[in-house]
């Protein structure tokens, strides 16, 4: 799986190892653990009653549509619903079929029964998606990919609502325009290293990659010096050479899109390329780590997801910290990940409050990538998805349809309530009712 991820998706050996081996293993192990926690969650019982929750699979199948950039996510999207008892149709990205094949073979060798997860590779996603979403048995969508594709699938689901037996579950993680925001008290070497890693690991092809930076004027010279020195030391080339830090982007279409942002920055009066900017597609789709400086904080590359080794920095006046917090929150429609660097607790708390909805995964003095299963449940809101937190019990709960079961061992045999039962000399009076002892907790019924 590691080798297929390196060769098929263009990851260096380290990125492939922490993805295809480590994170995929974590997803499988932790999801079993989370499922056990869910099943343990049972209601209280009282004398004469047995209450229980049954966590049923959805009534139908789940369609898992997976991305090219993470083999672990590619494996998690079909297996998470399957662990909760669902049948899954799995449409892997056409650009990562190699690692998807080995992932499926591993599941088969581990004993996965036939028909539980059904991998359906296709160059044309509609060949799988359209008939699946038109089926009356469609019960859920587990998706990671672009905003456009997710919204298209959601529209198809909406158009077919009358077809389905039950309202389907929709879980999606889409794009990000993830930020690093530094305060004047931040450690400049930590900030620079976070940029190098979060912006350029796996060529910036992570939905969590840092692609907009906000650095104060007083800190910028030191950050720039360390950052440029690190980038000058970074090697670019194929993953077969283990010394290469940056490899090729995934395909020609991605290459052309990323290059268009570099070319736009070269022509835009509100931006300038201050490092890198080179590219070559003669043999592979290679792009140098590129840093753009934006003089307008809402310049094109500060707002739009690029999904490549290009990041944009806006250098703000030190005395405009609060205004910059507002810029970070309002500039992008996404809200996936973000990081704040500062060494004052009051500043950190201020940023956490001001950016409450700007990132579903918020990092303090650390890069905004590499969420760890079981430690940082992953997902964002706004245009970044439904925020159902992969790598947690919150995600697994979306793939069950709970049923509450009440079993009575002492059911009543007559219909009247206690207060209207006649006594030996006649019916109860209102005074008798008013003076009656209150019922104990647990004797009442929930109004439903």
Model-predicted regions and their roles:
Residues 28, 100-103, 132, 153-154, ...:
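Hydrophobic packing residues within well-ordered alpha-helices of enzyme cores
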């Amino acid at each position: 799986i590691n080798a297929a991820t390196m060769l098929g998706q263009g990851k260096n050996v380290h990125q492939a190892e922490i993805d295809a081996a480590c994170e995929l293993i974590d997803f499988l192990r932790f999801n079993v653990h989370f499922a056990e926690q869910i099943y343990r969650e049972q209601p209280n019982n009282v004398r004469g009653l047995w209450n229980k929750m049954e966590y049923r699979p959805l009534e139908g199948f789940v369609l898992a549509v997976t991305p090219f950039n993470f083999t672990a996510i590619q494996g998690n999207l079909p297996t998470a619903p399957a662990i909760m008892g669902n049948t899954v149709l799995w449409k892997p990205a056409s650009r990562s079929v190699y690692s998807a094949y080995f992932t499926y073979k591993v599941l088969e060798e581990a004993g996965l029964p036939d028909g539980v997860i059904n991998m359906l590779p296709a160059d044309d996603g509609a060949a799988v998606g359209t008939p699946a979403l038109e089926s009356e048995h469609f019960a859920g969508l587990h998706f990671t990919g672009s905003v456009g594709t997710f919204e298209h699938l959601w529209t198809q689901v909406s158009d077919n609502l009358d077809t389905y037996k039950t309202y389907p579950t929709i879980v999606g993680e889409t794009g990000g325009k993830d930020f690093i925001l530094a305060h004047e008290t931040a450690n400049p070497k930590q900030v620079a290293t976070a940029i190098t890693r979060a912006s350029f690991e796996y060529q910036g092809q992570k939905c969590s990659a840092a692609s907009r930076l906000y650095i104060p004027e007083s800190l910028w010279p030191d950050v720039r010096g360390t950052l440029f020195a690190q980038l000058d030391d970074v090697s670019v080339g194929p993953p077969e050479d283990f010394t290469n830090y940056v490899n090729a982007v995934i395909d020609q279409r991605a290459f052309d899109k990323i290059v268009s942002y570099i070319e736009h920055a070269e022509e835009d009066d509100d931006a300038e390329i201050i490092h890198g900017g080179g590219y070559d597609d003669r043999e592979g789709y290679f792009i140098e780590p590129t840093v753009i400086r934006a003089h307008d904080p809402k310049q094109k590359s500060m707002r739009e997801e690029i999904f490549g080794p290009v990041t944009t920095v806006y250098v703000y006046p030190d005395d405009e910290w609060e205004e910059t917090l507002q810029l970070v929150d309002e500039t992008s429609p996404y809200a996936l990940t973000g990081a704040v660097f500062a060494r004052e607790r009051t500043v950190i708390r201020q940023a956490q409050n001001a950016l409450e909805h700007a990132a579903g995964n918020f990092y303090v003095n650390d890069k905004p990538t590499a969420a760890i299963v079981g430690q940082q449940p992953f997902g964002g809101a706004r245009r970044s998805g439904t925020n159902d937190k992969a790598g947690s019990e919150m995600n697994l709960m979306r793939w069950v349809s709970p049923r509450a079961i009440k079993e009575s061992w002492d059911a009543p045999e007559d219909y009247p309530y206690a207060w209207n039962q006649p006594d030996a000399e006649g019916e109860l009076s209102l005074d008798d009712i008013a003076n009656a002892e209150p019922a104990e907790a647990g004797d009442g019924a929930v109004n439903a």
